[in-house]
């Protein structure tokens, strides 16, 4: 692996992330003269559904997206031993999860600045006909004051002719919309909106809005609605947006265009 990457001009560094069938390593690119991140996907270790269905989608989608709030893919390489290497932009500030884990709840003004960028990224994706389907704090990377989305491993191109309804469970339980958890045919874009609500809540409260250790209990909590720790003094406009994002009825949940026009995001 190291020899293959060296021959392509990349000096491997430390591991900065690990998934089920992949890992992400820091590297130095001689070609770009800067640090990069390399996602290494092992096709041999992955199950057939992942190799035949999800991986080709990810590779197709990441090469078409181009937005300042989405991690850029510079190059894709494949070695003879069944490994795929995605050479990507490196966000050196870590992810939102670690930021909140180490520092606690973020100030509302900082959360607004970051969340606006997530809204812009998802607005772009949905406009391109792409649903991310795995939005979570770990997939929101930080580069200074900039937020950049990554990991399109569960992403899907949506048909333009009619509204897409999916029954596939993707992503992480804690961030999954109730219709996804229940296996109800659903609109993947509306699933992204719910997940954004969970990310927003975590940034503000440094905790999950619902208990993900017990799925039936979590579904009951979701129906009851989200509550806010009073000591954090979250503004009424922000609470209103969160309640709209975490609307259990997906037909009432706003589109990304409607989210972008919400008063909380419009105000300075």
Regions found by a protein language model. Name each.
Residues 13-19, 24:
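Protein kinase glycine-rich loop
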Residues 23-44:
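Glycine-rich ATP phosphate-binding loop
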Residues 114-115:
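Activation segment signature within eukaryotic-like protein kinase domains
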């Amino acid at each position: 692996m190291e020899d293959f990457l060296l021959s392509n001009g990349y000096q491997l560094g430390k591991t900065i992330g690990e998934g089920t069938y992949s890992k992400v390593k820091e590297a130095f690119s001689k070609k770009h003269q800067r640090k990069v991140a390399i996602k290494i996907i092992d096709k041999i270790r992955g199950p057939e559904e992942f190799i035949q269905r999800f991986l080709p989608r990810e590779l197709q989608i990441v090469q078409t997206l181009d937005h300042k709030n989405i991690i850029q893919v510079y190059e894709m390489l494949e070695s003879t031993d069944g490994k795929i290497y995605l050479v990507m932009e490196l966000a050196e500030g870590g992810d939102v999860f670690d930021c909140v884990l180490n520092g606690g709840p973020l100030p509302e003004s900082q959360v607004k600045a970051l969340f606006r960028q997530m809204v812009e990224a998802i607005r772009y994706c949905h406009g391109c006909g792409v649903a991310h389907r795995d939005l979570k704090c770990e997939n929101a990377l930080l580069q200074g004051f900039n937020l950049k989305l990554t990991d399109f491993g569960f992403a899907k191109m949506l048909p333009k002719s009619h509204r897409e309804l999916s029954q596939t469970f993707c992503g992480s339980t804690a961030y999954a919309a109730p219709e996804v958890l229940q296996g109800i045919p659903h609109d993947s874009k509306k699933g992204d909106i719910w997940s954004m609500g969970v990310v927003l809540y975590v940034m503000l409260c440094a905790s999950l809005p619902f208990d993900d250790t017990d799925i039936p209990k979590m579904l009951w909590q979701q129906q009851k609605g989200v509550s806010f720790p009073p000591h954090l003094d979250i503004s009424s406009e922000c609470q209103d947006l969160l309640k709209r994002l975490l609307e259990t009825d997906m037909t009432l949940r706003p589109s990304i265009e409607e989210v972008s026009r919400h008063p909380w995001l419009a105000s300075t």
